[in-house]
């Protein structure tokens, strides 16, 4: 049986790194879909500014509050600073589809573009015009891009 991984935002970072770790163990998934993969989290944690929260990146507090509601802990911030996101991800050499909204103001397009550079093999980036980060405008289009890719790779 074949396996595909999909992740959105921070889940895209998790899916990309999981695919890389599995590939390095000889257990590579058969397809990977990343929707607005949020590798910007590393820049934010290293820069001391995470979506409304400001902190000393070398000595973050016990937790910071982002978006006014979400708490991120000190260990999350410190661990994220040290992740080798792209280095881990590049061990995966299977087919990849990246999907990113043109109006995403949370995860910049450069994050998906960097993944395209990382995956030098069978990788493509689909830009969904007018879509935001939360996929509230063209959900059916985004889902269709993911499902059609998995259907072509896994069935």
Task: Give the predicted meaning of each segment.
Residues 7-11, 15:
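Gly/Ala-rich beta-loop-alpha elbow adjacent to hydrolase catalytic centers
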Residues 2-4, 20, 26-127, 131-152:
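The alpha/beta-hydrolase serine catalytic core
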């Amino acid at each position: 049986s074949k396996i595909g991984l999909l992740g959105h935002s921070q889940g895209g970072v998790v899916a990309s790194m999981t695919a890389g770790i599995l590939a390095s163990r000889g257990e590579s998934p058969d397809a990977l879909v990343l929707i607005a993969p949020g590798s910007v989290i590393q820049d934010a944690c290293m820069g001391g500014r995470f979506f409304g929260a400001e902190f000393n990146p070398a000595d973050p507090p016990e937790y910071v509050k982002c978006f006014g509601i979400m708490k991120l802990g000190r260990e999350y911030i410190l661990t994220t600073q040290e992740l080798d996101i792209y280095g881990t991800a590049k061990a995966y050499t299977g087919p990849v589809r990246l999907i990113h909204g043109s109006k995403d103001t949370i995860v910049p397009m450069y994050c998906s573009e960097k993944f395209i550079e990382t995956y030098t093999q069978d990788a493509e980036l689909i830009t969904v015009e007018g879509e935001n980060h939360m996929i509230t405008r063209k959900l059916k289009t985004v889902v269709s891009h993911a499902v059609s890719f998995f259907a072509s790779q896994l069935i």
